């Protein structure tokens, strides 16, 4: 049996949008879907029947969600899973055997910030994580992927290229960074210091996309090098008109202890469009 797309569902509008996005993807890729709903048992007291009540409420919620999902894509096999406690922990655990985890942005407005639980899922999942908001997708086109020379970014490009080729979309590979302030470079012997840095990063960008033309001969790839904008800001701007944004779980500047890098975190908290954290396989770091 194919690995399922696991969807965290609750009663928020963004969760409904996430379920719709996941169902469409599942139908296209011929994958099953598992709807996971977590009930809050922090105030559970058997003496007042709370446990039974929240469980029954959760069962009813999942049954209704399954019915709505079936109407969205009748050909997709949908199962449900009711869990107690934190949604972040439950989805993270199920990500080990999932094709993808899909969650809503956590709030009822487009571009709204993520809840702590949603960020937790994005940080600990062992598979790609799609975060979906209530964005108007009219007139949006193209897939954008952020790169920085890290192994995570290379995996993100591989994922984004496959998505763009499958969907018939153009791919924009964006490498953004800020060159050092003038006061930082005082005393540096190279008079063309900024040019040297820029050229080195241009090579990083070129190496990141190397091989895509051979693997996807019909894929249109745009390489963008931005030396005047912080990575997160550049990705947010590019994602504002994109159909999909793909980022790595963390970049080359992240500490080993961080499960979610600062750029990915910043992008998710201001979600510009459907965004995927492309965690494909574990990457070992020496730092």
Language model region names:
Residues 1, 14, 49-52, 67-101, ...:
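Structural beta-alpha unit
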Residues 1-52, 142-195, 213-216, 220-222, ...:
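Small/aliphatic-rich secondary-structure junction motif
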Residues 29-32, 76, 127, 169-170, ...:
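Short glycine/serine/threonine/alanine-rich loop segments
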Residues 34-36, 79-83, 130, 172-174, ...:
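General small-molecule cofactor/ligand-binding pocket signal
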Residues 51-60, 191-203:
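A short acidic, glycine-rich active-site loop
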Residues 102-122, 140, 244-266, 270:
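Glycine-rich, Arg-bearing micro-motifs that act as flexible, cationic patches
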Residues 102-105, 128-134, 275-279:
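Short beta-strand elements of ligand-binding domains
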Residues 113-135, 188-189, 196-197:
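Extended, non-globular alpha-helical segments
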């Amino acid at each position: 049996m194919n690995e399922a797309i696991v969807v965290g569902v609750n009663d928020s509008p963004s969760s409904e949008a996430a379920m719709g996005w996941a169902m469409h993807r599942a139908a296209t890729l011929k994958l099953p879907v598992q709807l996971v709903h977590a009930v809050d048992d922090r105030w559970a007291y058997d003496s007042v029947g709370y446990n039974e009540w929240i469980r029954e409420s959760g069962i009813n919620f999942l049954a209704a969600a399954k019915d709505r999902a079936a109407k969205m894509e009748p050909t997709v096999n949908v199962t449900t899973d009711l869990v107690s406690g934190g949604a972040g922990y439950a989805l993270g655990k199920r990500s080990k055997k999932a094709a993808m985890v899909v969650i809503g942005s956590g709030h009822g407005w487009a571009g709204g910030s993520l809840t702590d639980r949603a960020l937790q899922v994005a940080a600990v999942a062992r598979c790609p994580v799609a975060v979906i908001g209530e964005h108007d997708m009219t007139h949006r086109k193209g897939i954008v992927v952020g790169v920085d020379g890290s192994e995570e970014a290379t995996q993100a490009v591989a994922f984004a290229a496959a998505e763009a080729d499958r969907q018939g979309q153009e791919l924009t590979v964006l490498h953004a960074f800020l060159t050092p302030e003038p006061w930082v470079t005082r005393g540096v012997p190279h008079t063309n210091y900024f040019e040297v840095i820029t050229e080195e990063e241009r090579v990083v960008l070129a190496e990141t996309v190397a091989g895509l033309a051979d693997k996807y001969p019909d894929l249109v790839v745009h390489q963008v090098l931005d030396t005047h904008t912080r990575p997160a800001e550049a990705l947010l701007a590019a994602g504002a008109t994109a159909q999909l944004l793909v980022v790595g779980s963390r970049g080359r500047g992240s500490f080993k202890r961080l499960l979610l890098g600062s750029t990915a975190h910043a992008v998710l908290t201001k979600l510009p469009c459907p965004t995927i954290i492309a965690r494909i396989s574990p990457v070992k770091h020496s730092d």
